[in-house]
């Protein structure tokens, strides 16, 4: 047996153990000149000793080894053999030989394992356990679905939009206004407005015939017949003019722009009537079940728009008496803009309490449909799954599910438009896309999908498949002669009579998210199922192929193949057509493994070991077992693996978690696993990833469709009502009412009623009155000026002052006329002494004139001074005669003006009377002195 070698790695060389082990190495280097790489021996270190000493040492060691081997039986060794590698920062693999000299024990302690490798002890199989390879399997064939059919589809939904048509509204706007005329203002005290329907006779004979409308309105209110006239004048036909403002899709015509109102003379009430004939072309809307329709004016007509007198239309709904409804065949309506007659049509007229509405009658079945097209899909795949049809539409990212039975469209009320429209769409798509590559298979098919959708489907078949089917059909007809089969009293699925439910309707959901989720689920399911099916089939085929390979490789290396198949370390051997296996237990923690540094056979120069030599040492004292290192850390309990020695020998062996490198059958160094390149025997599984599917924002019903669901469009009604005043009345025109103008109008009407002569006189009178009114107007205008008002104020103030003084003068004339007329003459009367009687007689009164009284202020008056009674009486007579003279002159003047005899005669008589009364004497003016 060759000497033992060892290798180790040291970090702390100053330790006592290192120095002691170094002595041991020097000792062993004298025994074997070629030290292992990394063992610490730098040279051959040949130490010549005596032959006796060498043999003594060898015999001692060999005897100890033999004793240890003999003392341990194989069975007890396998029972106690375990591996427990030690672990440290720098661990050396060591081997402990149990009881022996301390040199061998030190060598074993110095070799610690670097990591925790797992080693297996594989005893040779004895044939007690045999196995065999499973024969090849039959791989399954998976089908994801059946009856896949491609085609074209048109999807329909419930029609929730209103039926729209044009209607014409005829009415007269009657406004009666009562106004109070003040001195400088006008006030409306009452206003009555009403809409009056226009009779159908006036529409047909006047409006649509001449483009005019009467200014007279006749209507019934409070069960009484009432008439109104525009501007309170005699009725006349007035031309219809277009309105100033029109909304989208609406036009209107009317007869006047003004609202008539009368302002009378101040302090009176006047009433004015305005009649405006209005014709509006508006939009009418009706929703299912079409028993009424609404107008954009806000009015609701409780009659079906399809009510008529022919083709059974009289069965439609109506809430009005028949005398209010009129239908004319071939009626030609007049275009009020171009004045041209339109094409003949069946025209309906309905008279309501407030308006007359007219519209063109059309049959119901040709105008409305309870279903409407939602989407056209050019490529659809239909498959049968779980007794249902699934229509997959990738362009819409949706999947619709329906029953396998076709749906009869005749069950749905007013669904006659679906097949005709769908057929036209399918023909167009087929002609433009599939005409050269596919053929149609049968007629179009109709299915009711979940959610209330109707799918009209046209199956298609590619030309290549069609040719294969034809060839197969020809082959079958050739091989099998035609035989007559007894007819069975059965029907095909499509011809099964279905009990129809009258007037059935469907309700479509407003969201299509459920179909999109169904499409996503089906897409994921299809992808996963297809992937799993391919994996299963490929896996089965791969197993069959690997089985054939393993069957051929088992004779070469049965242990490796058996370990791979059984997923555990075993030892195998071929025994004919079966394989004998034995289990390979792991070494426990109470064992150590020593790797020797030489692979040469001791005593031979041509024989070498093909695997490194090892020694398995039990730490519990059970002994040491010699063997070889097998593949993949397998420990072989024999040293039978030999080979001829070759030159340039280089080998790498896995030992634990590292590779050990041998060159020329000598240990060189240890190599880490990651420093050795790796080639993989595995085949990557190429799987297709799940494709990205984005949800498209699909709308079943658009915003316009949802807005059209109601009977009335309130936005259009509000727009029309707010525009009504702008369309038919001039809101910018202002009429200034004048009381003088009212007087003139009243006088003019009065003179016009007197005939031609009265009108001539009226012109003269109205001219003079107009001049007077103009003067008054100018005066009032002057007063309205601030400066004119100030001047008038000053004049009024001056007039008041003058009036005050005049009033005082008149009072003075009344109380003392002589003082007022002769203030200087009567001035001396104020100077009479107190107590003096002005009428008392005095001596020599005739000699002293009255003017001398009080001539001198220093002369005291005489007690007997006073007035002369005769003079006083003469003065009285003179005043009387002056009054008579004044009266006579006035009478004569009047007589001359009037040229009347009685007045002249009276004047003459008055003069004669005055002449007969001349018995007075003249008052002396000079001073009379006494004789």
Curated annotation (Swiss-Prot):
GO BP term, pick one: virion attachment to host cell
Span(s) of short sequence motif Golgi targeting: 881-884
Motif placement: Di-leucine internalization motif: 904-906
Site, Cleavage: residue positions: 494-495
Virion surface side: 72-786
Listed transmembrane segments: 787-807
Membrane-related topology note: Single-pass type I membrane protein
Annotated keywords: Disulfide bond, Glycoprotein, Host cell membrane, Host endosome, Host Golgi apparatus, Host membrane, Host-virus interaction, Membrane, Signal, Transmembrane, Transmembrane helix, Viral attachment to host cell, Viral envelope protein, Virion, Virus entry into host cell
Main location as per UniProt: virion
One GO term describing the cellular component: viral envelope
Protein name: Envelope glycoprotein B
Species of origin: Varicella-zoster virus (strain Dumas)
Lineage: Viruses, Duplodnaviria, Heunggongvirae, Peploviricota, Herviviricetes
Encoding gene, per UniProt annotation: gB
């Amino acid at each position: 047996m060759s000497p033992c070698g060892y290798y180790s790695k040291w970090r702390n060389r100053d330790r006592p153990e290192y120095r002691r082990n170094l002595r041991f190495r020097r000792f062993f280097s004298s025994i074997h000149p070629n030290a292992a790489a990394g063992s610490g021996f730098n040279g051959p270190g040949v130490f010549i000793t005596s032959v006796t000493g060498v043999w003594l040492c060898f015999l001692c060691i060999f005897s100890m080894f033999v004793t240890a081997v003999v003392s341990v039986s194989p069975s007890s060794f396998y029972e106690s053999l375990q591996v427990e590698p030690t672990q440290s920062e720098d661990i050396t693999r060591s081997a402990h030989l149990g009881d022996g000299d301390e040199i061998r024990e030190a060598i074993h302690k110095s070799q610690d394992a670097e990591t925790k490798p797992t080693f297996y002890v594989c005893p040779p199989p004895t044939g007690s356990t045999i196995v065999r390879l499973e024969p090849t399997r039959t791989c399954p064939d998976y089908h994801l679905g059946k009856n896949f059919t491609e085609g074209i589809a048109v999807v329909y939904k419930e029609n929730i939009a209103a039926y729209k048509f044009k209607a014409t509204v005829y009415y007269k706007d009657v406004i009666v206004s009562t106004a109070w005329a003040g001195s400088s203002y006008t006030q409306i005290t009452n206003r009555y407005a009403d809409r009056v329907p226009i009779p159908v006779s006036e529409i047909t004979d006047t409006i649509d015939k001449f483009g005019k409308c009467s200014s007279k309105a006749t209507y019934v209110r409070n069960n009484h017949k009432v008439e109104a006239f525009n501007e309170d004048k005699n009725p006349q036909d007035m031309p219809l003019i277009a309105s100033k403002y029109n909304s989208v899709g609406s036009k209107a015509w009317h007869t006047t722009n003004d609202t008539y109102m009368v302002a009378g003379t101040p302090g009176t009430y006047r009433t004015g009537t305005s009649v405006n004939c209005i014709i509006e072309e508006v939009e009418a809307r009706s929703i299912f079940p079409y028993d009424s329709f609404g107008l954009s004016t806000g009015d609701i007509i409780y009659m079906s728009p399809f009510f008529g007198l022919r083709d059974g239309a009289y069965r439609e709904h109506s809430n009005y008496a028949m005398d209010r409804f009129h239908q004319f065949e071939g009626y030609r309506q007049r275009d009020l803009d171009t004045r041209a007659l339109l094409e003949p049509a069946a025209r309906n007229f309905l008279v309501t309490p407030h308006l007359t509405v007219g519209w063109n009658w059309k049959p119901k079945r040709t105008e409305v449909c309870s279903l409407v097209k939602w989407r056209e899909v050019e490529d659809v795949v239909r498959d049968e799954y779980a007794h249902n049809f699934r229509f997959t539409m990738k362009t819409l990212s949706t999947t619709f599910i329906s029953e396998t039975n076709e749906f009869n469209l005749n069950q749905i009320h007013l669904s006659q438009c679906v097949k005709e429209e769908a057929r036209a769409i399918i023909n167009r798509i087929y002609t433009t896309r599939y005409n050269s590559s596919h053929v149609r298979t049968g007629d179009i098919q109709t299915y009711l999908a979940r959610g209330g959708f109707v799918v009209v489907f046209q199956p298609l078949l590619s030309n290549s498949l069609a040719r294969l089917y034809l060839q197969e059909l020809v082959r079958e007809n050739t091989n099998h002669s035609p035989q007559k089969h007894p007819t069975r009293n059965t029907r095909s699925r499509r011809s099964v009579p279905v009990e129809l439910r009258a007037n059935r309707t469907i309700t479509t959901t407003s969201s299509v998210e459920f179909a999109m989720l169904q499409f996503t689920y089906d897409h994921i399911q299809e992808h996963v199922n297809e992937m799993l099916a391919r994996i299963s089939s490929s896996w089965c085929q791969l197993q069959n192929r690997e089985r054939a390979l393993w069957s051929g490789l088992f004779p070469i290396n049965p242990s490796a193949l058996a370990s791979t198949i059984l997923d555990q370390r075993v030892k195998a051997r071929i025994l004919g057509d079966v394989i004998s296996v034995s289990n390979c237990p792991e070494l426990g923690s109470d064992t150590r493994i020593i790797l020797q540094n030489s692979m040469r056979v001791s005593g031979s120069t041509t024989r070498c070991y093909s695997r490194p030599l090892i020694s398995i040492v039990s730490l519990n004292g059970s002994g040491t077992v010699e063997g070889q290192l097998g593949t993949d850390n397998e420990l072989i309990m024999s040293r039978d693996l030999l080979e001829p020695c070759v030159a340039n020998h280089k080998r790498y062996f896995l030992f634990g978690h590292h590779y050990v490198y041998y060159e020329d059958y000598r240990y060189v160094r240890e190599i880490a696993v990651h420093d050795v390149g790796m080639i993989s025997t595995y085949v990557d599984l190429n799987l297709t990833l799940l494709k990205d599917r984005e949800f498209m924002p699909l709308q079943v019903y658009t915003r316009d469709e949802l807005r059209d669901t109601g009977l009335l469009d309130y936005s259009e009604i509000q727009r029309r009502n707010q525009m009504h005043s702008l369309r038919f009345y001039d809101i910018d025109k202002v009429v200034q009412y004048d009381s003088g103008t009212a007087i003139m109008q009243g006088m003019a009407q009065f003179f016009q009623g007197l005939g031609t002569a009265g009108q001539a006189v009226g012109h003269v009178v109205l001219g003079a009155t107009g001049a007077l009114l103009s003067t008054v107007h100018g005066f009032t205008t002057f007063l309205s000026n601030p400066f004119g008002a100030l001047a008038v104020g000053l004049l009024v103030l001056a007039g008041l002052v003058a009036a005050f003084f005049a009033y005082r003068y008149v009072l003075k004339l009344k109380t003392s006329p002589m003082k007022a007329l002769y203030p200087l003459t009567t001035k001396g009367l104020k100077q009479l002494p107190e107590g003096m009687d002005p009428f008392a007689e005095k001596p020599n009164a005739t000699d002293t004139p009255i003017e001398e009284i009080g001539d001198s202020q220093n002369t005291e008056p005489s007690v007997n001074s006073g007035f002369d009674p005769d003079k006083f009486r003469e003065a009285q007579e003179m005043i009387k005669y002056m009054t008579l003279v004044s009266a006579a002159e006035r009478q004569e003047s009047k007589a001359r003006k009037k040229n009347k005899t009685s007045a002249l005669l009276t004047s003459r008589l008055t003069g004669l009377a005055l002449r007969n009364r001349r018995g007075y004497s003249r008052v002396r003016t000079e001073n009379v002195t006494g004789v």
